[in-house]
């Protein structure tokens, strides 16, 4: 048996017992550094985008960090968003936004997808699919919560959702 590691899939890494385990989306995206770079690019785009800038009216110094923490935790990284801010923070922030329109929700998704390459994110199909599904879900939840008039109208999610690789088809 050879001592060389056979890498079958770039999304896998060696397990300590010699078996292969799948890398988390967080690790695959480059961890905090990769996700922070991506969130910074998205945020810069949102601040000047004619459709999104009514929701992103001014630069908030902590916003990129909060976006990074949320995505990192969702993708299997540290639970910093939950520890530092608590999930209720996310609900409260979106409930105070002006009602998010369908056009804004769609543009939000498109803006994220547009910065993936510039942000140096992996271009494999499964990562891009997982990322798109994550952003689409988040945009739908944010839109619903922005329109909530009562607690009963808020999307019934009480913790940062954990995202994983899509099933192989």
Model-predicted segments: where are they?
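Core of compact, soluble alpha-helical bundle domains
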Residues: 2-169
């Amino acid at each position: 048996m050879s001592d060389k590691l056979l890498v079958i899939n770039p999304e896998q890494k060696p397990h300590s017992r010699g078996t292969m385990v799948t890398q988390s989306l967080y690790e695959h995206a480059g961890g905090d550094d990769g996700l922070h770079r991506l969130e910074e690019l998205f945020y810069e785009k949102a601040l000047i985008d004619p459709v999104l800038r009514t929701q992103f009216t001014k630069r908030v110094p902590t916003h990129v960090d909060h976006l990074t923490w949320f995505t990192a935790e969702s993708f299997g990284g540290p639970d910093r968003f939950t520890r530092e801010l608590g999930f209720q923070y996310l609900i409260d922030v979106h409930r105070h936004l002006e009602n998010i329109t369908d056009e804004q929700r769609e543009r939000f998704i498109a803006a994220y997808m547009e910065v993936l390459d510039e942000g140096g994110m992996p271009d494999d199909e499964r990562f891009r699919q997982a990322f798109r599904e994550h952003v689409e879900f988040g945009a739908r939840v944010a839109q619903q919560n922005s329109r909530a008039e009562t607690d009963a109208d808020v999307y019934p999610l009480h913790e940062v959702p954990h995202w994983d690789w899509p099933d192989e088809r």
